Amino acid sequence: MFYALYFEIHHLVASAALGFARVAPIFFFLPFLNSGVLSGAPRNAIIILVALGVWPHALNEAPPFLSVAMIPLVLQEAAVGVMLGCLLSWPFWVMHALGCIIDNQRGATLSSSIDPANGIDTSEMANFLNMFAAVVYLQNGGLVTMVDVLNKSYQLCDPMNECTPSLPPLLTFINQVAQNALVLASPVVLVLLLSEVFLGLLSRFAPQMNAFAISLTVKSGIAVLIMLLYFSPVLPDNVLRLSFQATGLSSWFYERGATHVLE
C-alpha cells in the first residue's frame, strides 16, 4: 500500500513539474505577477495551483518524476511557457519602452547616460506606464485572457505529445516592441525636439543663459503637459489593441513556411 502511494506521489509531482514549466515563465514576465508583487514560496504555490487547474490530463498520467522521459517534456514545456510569457507581456513591454523613451528625451535618465554602471536601471515613467498597462489589462479581463491562452495552448500543444513552438518569430520581438514604442512616443518626442530647438535659438541671443540647465525643467514640464493631453484618449486603447488573445495562438506553433507578425 505504501509503495503504491509512493509511486503515485511521483506521478503527481511530475504533473506539477510539467505544469510549472509552462506556467512559471508567464508569472515571471507579467508585471502584476512577477517577483515585485509575488515572491518566494507563495508565488511558487500559486503557480502550481494554476498549473494543476489547467492541466489537461489525469494527474497520474505523467511519467515518473525522476525518469529520463521527463527531460524532453520539461524542455518542451519551458519553451512553450517562454513563448506564452513573451506574447502575454507584449503590451507591458511596449509601455515600459515608451516610458523609457520619454524619460530619456526629457533628461530624467541622464545619470544612466553619463555613468551607466551607477545610473538608474529603470525610469519612473517606465514603471508608471508599466503599472498603468497592468491596471488596464486586469480591468478588462486580463486574468481570464491569460487562462484562456493557457487552455488554448494545452489544446494545441499537448504536454504528453511532441509539439514545437515557433520560437524564431520571437527573435523579431525587440524590433516590434521598439517600433510600437517609438510610434506611441513620437508626439511627445517631437514636441521635446521643438523645445530644444527654441532653447538653442534663445541661447544664441542670450549667451549668459545656461540653456542646458533650463532645458531639463522646461522639457519635463512640456512632457507632463503633452502626456496629460495624450494619455487618456490613446494609451488605454493601445494596451487593449496590443493584448494577445487566445484566438491567435494557433499560428505560433511551428508550421513550415509560416510567417508570424504581431500587429
UniProtKB/Swiss-Prot annotation:
Gene responsible for this protein: spaR
Query: Which residues are in coiled coils?
Result: none
What job does this protein perform? Involved in a secretory pathway responsible for the surface presentation of determinants needed for the entry of Salmonella species into mammalian cells.
Keyword annotations for this protein? Cell membrane, Membrane, Transmembrane, Transmembrane helix, Virulence
Membrane topology of the entry? Multi-pass membrane protein
Q: Which family does it belong to?
A: Belongs to the FliR/MopE/SpaR family.
GO cellular component: a single term: plasma membrane
Q: What is this protein called?
A: Surface presentation of antigens protein SpaR
Query: Where exactly are the transmembrane stretches of this chain?
Result: 12-32, 46-66, 82-102, 127-147, 182-202, 211-231
Name where it's found: Cell membrane
The primary location reported for this protein is membrane
Question: What is the native source organism of this protein?
Answer: Salmonella typhimurium (strain LT2 / SGSC1412 / ATCC 700720)
According to its UniProt entry, one GO biological process term is: protein targeting
Which PANTHER family does the UniProt record give? FLAGELLAR BIOSYNTHETIC PROTEIN FLIR, SURFACE PRESENTATION OF ANTIGENS PROTEIN SPAR
